[in-house]
């Protein structure tokens, strides 16, 4: 992808569109009226907790300032689950395409024409990063950008959030998982079931995973952008996820292999989210170019 120009990869990501401005304003105005929602989103909580552990003190301070505007929990890790908790609320239907990217089989390089007019996870990440970086924007809009950015960086690292339109990212592909009697969605396996073992103690597990990110991994993971991360996910979707589910059964050995992939992607997402947030909120921190 190195020979792609930024204009080919994400035309218009360098500025905040009128549509996104309206979306952030609507989110900022509408959030206070939302009802309370239950728990969920172990993976998103873990990614944002890992990011929190890796952020600079200045960036943490900015996140805390924004999260204090939130009604209810002020924890960043909870804010990162908000985009899923409002699914089903018609006021936020416009967010639906921002969670994923559909690609034709065999795609090896991202260009902006692959992102539809209504948006995709790659464009969402890049434009939300710009919005969060702009200290002139109203605090409530920056809060919404922060929560959505935390969520979508997680989504782009889940392999099946960059998949095929024909089966809706594995949602329509049913498999038998472990000893469960009824077939379930392949997407559900990767969104939730592979993370079940972490759900009860996700905070300490997240901190352990954060401590395990070494110098070499930090160097390797501190490069690229949302388009690169999406193509990593798509490579995993084509080379591993669908191969494991080819016979309609995910057995014990395949579960172990899939959990290893999930662990790596959660760690990568957490580190990269910290990298992006440090650059957006701490002028002294290195990170993606504006």
Give the ranges of each region predicted by the language model.
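Intrinsic-disorder/low-complexity regions
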Residues: 2-3, 83
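Sec-dependent N-terminal signal peptides
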Residues: 23-31
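N-terminal signal peptide c-region/cleavage motif recognized by signal peptidases
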Residues: 33-35
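Bacterial N-terminal signal peptides that target proteins for export
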Residues: 3-24
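N-terminal, motif-rich segments that launch catalysis or mediate targeting to/interaction with membranes
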Residues: 37-152, 159-290
């Amino acid at each position: 992808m190195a020979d792609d120009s930024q204009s080919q990869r994400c035309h218009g990501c360098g500025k905040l569109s009128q549509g996104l401005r309206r979306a952030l304003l609507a989110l900022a105005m509408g959030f206070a009226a939302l009802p309370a929602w239950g728990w969920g989103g172990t993976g998103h909580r873990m990614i944002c907790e890992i990011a929190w552990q890796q952020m600079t003190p200045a960036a943490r301070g900015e996140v805390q300032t924004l999260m204090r505007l939130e009604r209810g929990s002020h924890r960043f890790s909870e804010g990162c689950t908000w985009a899923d908790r409002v699914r089903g609320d018609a006021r936020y239907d416009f967010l639906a395409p921002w969670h994923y990217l559909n690609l034709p089989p065999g795609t090896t390089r991202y260009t902006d024409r692959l992102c539809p007019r209504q948006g995709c996870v790659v464009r969402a990440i890049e434009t939300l990063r710009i919005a969060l970086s702009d200290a002139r924007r109203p605090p409530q809009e920056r809060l919404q950008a922060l929560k959505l950015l935390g969520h979508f960086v997680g989504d782009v690292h889940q392999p099946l959030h960059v998949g095929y339109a024909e089966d809706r990212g594995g949602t329509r592909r049913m498999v038998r998982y472990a000893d469960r009697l009824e077939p379930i969605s392949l997407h559900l396996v990767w969104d939730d079931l592979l993370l079940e073992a972490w759900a009860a103690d996700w905070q300490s597990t997240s901190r352990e995973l954060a401590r395990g990110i070494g110098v070499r991994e930090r160097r390797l993971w501190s490069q690229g952008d949302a388009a690169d991360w999406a193509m990593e996910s798509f490579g995993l979707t084509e080379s591993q996820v669908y191969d494991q589910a080819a016979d309609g059964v995910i057995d014990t050995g395949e579960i172990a292999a899939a959990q290893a992939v999930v662990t790596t992607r959660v760690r990568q997402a957490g580190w990269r989210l910290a990298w992006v947030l440090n650059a957006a909120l701490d002028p002294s921190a290195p990170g993606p170019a504006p």
